Amino acid sequence: MMFGNLPDVRKPKEGYKKYLEYFDLRFPRIQEEKHFQSYYYYTYLKQIRISIIFLTSVLFIGTMTAYISPLDISYLPYYDSKNIYYFNYVQPNVTTTSSSTTTTSSTTNSIDSTVENNNFTEADGHLTNYYFPYLANKARDTFILRMITIGLLLFYFIFTFTAKFKRLWKLFTTITLFLVSCIVLIFESDIRTIPGRMVLLFIIIAISSGMTFLPSMLASGGLCLFFFFYFMFYSQIAGKQMVLLSLVLLISWIILMIISRFKEQLFRDKFRTLENLKIQTIRSEKIINQMLPTVVVQRLRLQSSKDQSLETTLENDKELSIKKDEESNLTGKKQSKVVVSPPPPPTAAAPQQQDNEISTPQNSRKIVDPQSPSSLMPGQYSVTDLIVDSYDPVTVLFCEIVNFNALVEKMSSTQVINLLNEVYNSFDRLTDVYGVTKVEHIGNVYMVVGGCPELCPDHAQRVAHMSLGMLSVIRRFGIVQVRIGMHTGPVVGGIIGKKKLSWHLFGDTINTSSRMASHSSIGRIQVSHPVQQLLRPYFLFEDRGKIQVKGKGLMRTFYLVKTKQLDKRYTSIFSSLHREKPYIPPVDISEVSFENQNNTIGKGDDIASGSATGPTHPNIPNSMLSAIPSRVSIEMNPLGGSGSIQKRERKGSIFANVMPPKVLNFLQTGSLTSPQQQPLPQQSNSEETISNSPRLSSTPQSTSTLQHSSSTGALGSLINNNNNNNNNNNNNNNNNNNNNNNNNNNNNNNNNNNNNNNNNNNNNNLPVSLISPISQNTTPTGSLSLPVTEKKKQTVQFGSISRSSSISKGTVGRSPSPALFDGGIEMDDNGGGAGDDFNTMEPNLDLGKGIHGSNVISTNNSKLNKLEKDLTKHYTLDKFKLSFISRGNLVEKEYRNEYILKNWNRILASMLMIVALFGLSGLVDYFFLKLSSISSIVKVEPMPSSSSSSLSSSSSNSMTSSEEKFITLHTIRSEENLIYDIITGVRYGFVFFCLIVIYVVSKFKTFSIRKWIQEVVMVFFIVLAAVLIVLTSVPPLNKIPLDSVILSIEIMFITICYNFSGIKFWYSNIVCAFCIIFIEISKTWKQAYHSRDIYLSHNYYLITAVLINIITSYFEELFNRLNWVHGRLLDKDQRETESLVAEILPADIVKSMKSGRQLIVDEFKNVTIFLSDIVGFTEMAARMSPRQLVETLNQIYSTFDEIAQEFGVLKIATIGDAYFCVSGCPDKDQTDHAFRVANMAIKMLESIKSIRTVDNIPIRMRIGIHTGPVIAGVVGIKMIHYQLWGESVQITQQMESTSRADMIHVSEDTFNILKSKYLFEERPDGIIKKRKIKTYFLLRALTENDPQPEVKTRSVSVSKSNFGGSLQYNQITPTLNLPVSQLIIKDQNEIKNQNDHDNDDENGNENGNESSSSNINEEEEDDDNSNNNNNNEDDESSYEDDQEMNQYLNNSENNKNNNNNSNQINEEDGNWAKNYDGSSESS
């Protein structure tokens, strides 16, 4: 299932209900259906009003035309024997001749002249008195009734602007259209105008009214019933002809209803696409922000987009040049090849201009194509554009779980990971509460930083509150013991490598913070002296004195105790947490948090409305905000979202899971009492601080800030769809509606806000805990910054980017606004200026206001509008030609190909529809022709029998008048019937020919033929319309009034062609033009035989229907193209997110999260772990600048990433200068995991030889490999990544730390797997920090020329009670044939220097590598009691281990001379040993 798709949870219907699903297009979820109805209403509201005006105009013009120039219906024949009023035929004086042919010809001419001269007389005088009793007053009554109807329509048009119309607009519109359509048919006595009039009314109701399928079907269906009963019972028109006419209208109604349903389904598909795109965008941002900080993501997007825009432009130019070359080769013209040279790189000022440019091919501006590779694909940025920034100062916190190894021994692996997941989830939520950034968690160490990547001056206070909150949470778990350390100083942050993108911090501050945690006491917070200096005015400390810090010497440290300002309340509440019943909060990975997007401030006009009287807040009295000046600056959300200032408590949130009710009440109100009993304090001057939270502190700055931080959901919640976003969309939205409506009324802005708050949802209260003071020049993401006194614009430098003090709108997590890149938008004191520009830039379309008056999808407004505006950046659409002009003709071809494949069945169905109408018109015309000729309406008495005998006896005698008339009319009728039969046969023969054509077209398989289907359909429609007109215009049919049926059929042809055929808009215009030409020629041909008035009426109906279809077809074509682009953006965003997640998490883990698995933990019995470390990293970092250091690491790790990907090894993480990989998990099918890792390690050692530092010093590294069981999984909800736990990880780290430079150190388990294919050297000093493990150095892979001798190698076991060494012989093959004496370093001081050097390397791992080492080597610190004495004991223990190793080396050196039976070393190995000794000394 795709990330953004909403699953269908409807139950399958049975019985007759399943057949009703065709008419029920509603979404299965009530909330989603409400969103759609609201969105549909505000999208089609203008079209509804336009349809009312159009219907009013049509009715008015038709009424005036009928009143001024009424149709002449005195000679109109009616097509049924019961209703035909016969006329006596007055035979003119005609000269009788002996020739029957002459007589027949003269008689026919006399009949024609009689018809033309209207020489009919009433037979019985009841035509006027009986059938049309109201003929005298018909025109007057019709005029009065229709003018009243026009007045009612105008009143209804005004009614559409009221609030009551919005609630039942479908019902009102349905009733109105039905009544108006019925009134249009009343007093209509000319049956020739009824078909065209009915079809036009159907088109207005079904297509142009803007109503959905069911209301349109009800209104038009009611009109059909009215038509049938009115003309059948009131006008008394009945018989076969009336039934056939009704059949034509019924088929036309069915076809129009199919088109109406199709259009609604198309609109619903677009809405679902936009909803999925919106949800996918939100979830993608949340997922990405869980992997990387928001600021880093935005900079990475911006930078990658610039690089890819150039690449895309070059690729498009190349494609166009290749296309031109191919065309020239086909035409035989020789053209010179086009050589595309890349444009010069943009300057420092160029990027901002390029971002604001709209991509058009005319000005050759850069195009950002959503079909191009992901804008967030890793490795798309160059070394010169690394995401690296320096931050000074920041506060770093390390929290270490001390008894983690003890928990692992006492509890099962699943229980330990569950516990760890609960702890880290609680910590992750606390980072949102206190506004700090989680860097990462490594094993049992949790790292937090304040002040970067988002700058804030109170970073130390935030981190201090975070540390106290972490202790309060840990007390609830009972069995977990932690120690916390803090330090303040400068750091460097950036992203390195091509795989497993992660944001790391580098610098001595990180190392010192790790030391503060490792030297702290259990349950205490140890801070350095710089931190104590920053927090001294706000917190109480306990002076610990000077302690010996590993790698730092003596440092003065302090224990953080509690706060000063909130002494009683804070300490009493949080100290009572451990007395409550231990409670582990439930994990709900399917929980989705959409507060940031759903609870919004509003758009630009919302803020502009309050600019005159100052900023407002829905839950703060105006008296408190009266002192706040109105000059503020606004930051726009990169995604166009709205800022969140309200939060509704929901089940499973941070406040419900982490904090008990007492603390929750305190966080909301600042008091232990109920929220109703604790009023907000009044602000008297600018020096006072608005705060009632645990983070309250008096700052010297003369600023006041209202901050709101919201928590982010879990990654699983972002992947698995949840209905919380739909359920929360109904809240907090009336404020936005009223603010939008009162945009221009600045004087009443505050009153409107207060009224809205009193009338709207009561659950949307802003927790007071989210209010904290920070300075004016800082805007934490997700906060509302209200400057109090200073109006001077202040900026904070972030690398090369500056940002102004602003109001953050709708940022995701703590995402900054585009003001970082494009600058903020300022509003003057009078509310004008840039505020108007903001409203112009992002207009309020009021999308999604609910049926019951609530803005149920206000979130969609800015999101969908922003998406609509972004289309011009991705695709350039020519709105006149309705074609894409981006990238030459490539985009247009791609759209056309996909459109044809998607709408193939629809195109064939449209062809069947017009063929069915063509055949139906032939059937109807046949029965009309039988009874519509002049011979059928003239009453002829039967010829007497005497005439028959006299005719047979004497043909030469002259005939009587009646006999001559009978023979003449009988001959005419026989000739006409023969012609009618021939024409009908030709029609149905053509119908069968068309069916054969459709069958042949449907069998087209190759796309090279299918791509011409639109042209084929266009010709098919034109030919069918021409045949229909021609067959009804040949003599004698040109003298018969068949235009009423033909007109309705042609209008249906045009409607199907425009709205259902699936051909291009301009092709439909060509078809329509030919239809109009054919009809007009036919009318001109028939005009000599019929009245001109009826043709004027037909032209009126025809032109009106054509205009309606042109407008609707144009917008449908535009609609389809925009919807296609939305789908491409959705696919692009999904690909980007999945690509990024795949780079950070394994594919199997992503699938598990998609399936709804809440906790991802697995046990693997046999995997191979790889860990490398750079030798002398501390000295190397001291010689290089921070940026040079990060660039060097990026070069190294990018190379390693490519090698790891080549061998299919999974990169776990980079920890400072350590590179951590694993093979064999999570893919259990990798049985050759040890060989993969071994080959990768060998190639890494070869590749790193070509990398040097800036001072041309080669880089050397140590590698450790071990094979064993591990526990792997994902814990936490922020900055998550795939992790490993277990003893095998610790052994691997020890293998690396005890290895030698440029050597691959493997354990015995790995050696047993690889010994048959690789050459090894046994390491005799086999003690690995309290572990008796045989270890080996992997040299290279075996070749065919290498001998495989079986030799006895030495394995050493050392006992702690006896410092001597014992030698044991085991048969192990193959190994390097070297004497032990050559493998032992002779100088004991060299061993000591090597160990010291390794310790320095550990100290130099500047991204918590020391913390990682402390995580893995917990055996040395399990018994710490968190005091200085225990730390000294650790040093003594470490010293004893060194003495044991030295004593063993002495014994080995003494026994060296006794080893006379050792094999001789060859020259190559001797050189290697010599080089190794020299390299060790140099290192």
From Swiss-Prot:
Gene name for this UniProt entry: gca
PROSITE patterns in the record: GUANYLATE_CYCLASE_2
Main location class: membrane
Cofactor: Mg(2+)
Family of the protein in this entry: Belongs to the adenylyl cyclase class-4/guanylyl cyclase family.
Compositionally biased residues, Low complexity: 672-684, 693-712, 720-765, 1405-1416, 1446-1465
Topology relative to the membrane: Multi-pass membrane protein
GO CC, alphabetical: cell leading edge; membrane; plasma membrane
Biased composition (Acidic residues): 1432-1444
Protein name per Swiss-Prot or TrEMBL: Guanylyl cyclase, membrane
Domain Guanylate cyclase: 395-517, 1168-1296
Record: residues binding Mg(2+) 1: 1173, 1217
Pfam family, one: Guanylate_cyc
